[in-house]
Every structure is written in C-alpha cells, then in structure tokens.
C-alpha cells in the first residue's frame, strides 16, 4: 500500500498504455483508478469568502493548460462570473477541476458531457457564450 506522500512530482502519463507512471517505487495506476479511489482530492475551500472565490476562479480561468481553453474560459469568466451566485460559482469551480480538453470538447459539442454535467447551468451558459460569439477573434480580456 502506498500513500499520497509517496507520489512524486515527477510523473508522466502514457497515452498508449493508459497508465500513470510515477517516479521511484509507487505502483502503476490507471487514471480511472485514481479517480475512483479518490487518491487525488480537491483542496478543501469551505472557508473561502465569496470575494476570494471569485478572484480565484478568474485566475484559474485565465491560467489553464491549453490556449484554447484559456481564451474561452477567460472571456466567459469576465462576462458571467459577476452575475453568478455562490452556488453557481461552486459549480463553475467543479467544472474547472475537469481536464482542459474535456471542457473544450463539451462546450464546443465535439463530445457529449458526462451525465453529471448534462443539466449544468454553467455548462449551458458556456455553450451559449460560445455560440453567441460565432466568428469573433478571441483574446485574453484585461483584468
């Protein structure tokens, strides 16, 4: 048995085998195994103020992993986050915990979102935001 502490920062994902390999002696784990066993848990943010939550979500929307998602989510955050209540902000926070490519495919309609996101107002707003900006050249909005 191993613990989270045994997982080193140096890791890589092999797309061919679908196995996460960790540096040193940690065992091989599949991505789904990590999610099922909840080995990677989100940070507890239960004591976060609404102002801090909004600020963090704006930052996380701008600093993703791929440029396409950065451009989409940063514009979306600027336009929608000020209108959202705390409940919707937390839903958006959960969406940001998903992989960048998944978010991109779901909001563009390339792939269907998983069942737990099908009735999401945030994902619906994100799709609406993209469809209303058809043909617009995207750029990172100023803070």
Curated annotation (Swiss-Prot):
Where would you find the membrane-spanning parts of this chain?
none
Signal peptide range equals none
Q: Where in the cell is it found?
A: Mitochondrion matrix
Which UniProt keywords are listed? Chaperone, Mitochondrion
Keyword RNA-binding attached: no
Q: Which GO terms describe its cellular component?
A: mitochondrial matrix; mitochondrion
- Please give one Pfam family short name: Sdh5
Name a biological process GO annotation. mitochondrial electron transport, succinate to ubiquinone
Q: Where is it mainly found? A: mitochondrion
Similarity comment text for this entry: Belongs to the SDHAF2 family.
PANTHER family the record matches: PROTEIN EMI5 HOMOLOG, MITOCHONDRIAL, SUCCINATE DEHYDROGENASE ASSEMBLY FACTOR 2, MITOCHONDRIAL
Q: How does it assemble?
A: Interacts with the flavoprotein subunit within the SDH catalytic dimer.
The miscellaneous annotation reads: This protein may be expected to contain an N-terminal transit peptide but none has been predicted.
**Stated role:** Plays an essential role in the assembly of succinate dehydrogenase (SDH), an enzyme complex (also referred to as respiratory complex II) that is a component of both the tricarboxylic acid (TCA) cycle and the mitochondrial electron transport chain, and which couples the oxidation of succinate to fumarate with the reduction of ubiquinone (coenzyme Q) to ubiquinol. Required for flavinylation (covalent attachment of FAD) of the flavoprotein subunit of the SDH catalytic dimer.
Q: What is the official name of this protein in its record?
A: Succinate dehydrogenase assembly factor 2, mitochondrial
Q: Which organism is it from?
A: Schizosaccharomyces japonicus (strain yFS275 / FY16936) (Fission yeast)
């Amino acid at each position: 048995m191993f613990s989270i502490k045994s997982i080193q920062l140096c890791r890589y994902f092999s797309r061919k085998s679908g196995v996460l390999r960790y540096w040193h002696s940690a065992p091989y784990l599949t991505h789904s195994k990590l999610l099922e066993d909840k080995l990677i848990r989100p940070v507890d943010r239960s004591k976060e103020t609404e102002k801090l939550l909004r600020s963090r979500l704006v930052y996380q929307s701008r600093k993703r992993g791929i440029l396409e998602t950065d451009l989409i989510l940063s514009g979306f955050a600027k336009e929608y986050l000020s209108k959202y209540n705390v409940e919707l902000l937390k839903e958006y926070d959960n969406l940001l915990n998903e992989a960048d490519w998944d978010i991109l495919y779901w909001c563009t309609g390339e792939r269907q979102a998983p069942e737990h996101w099908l009735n999401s107002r945030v994902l619906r707003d994100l799709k609406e935001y993209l469809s209303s900006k058809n043909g617009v050249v995207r750029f990172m909005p100023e803070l």
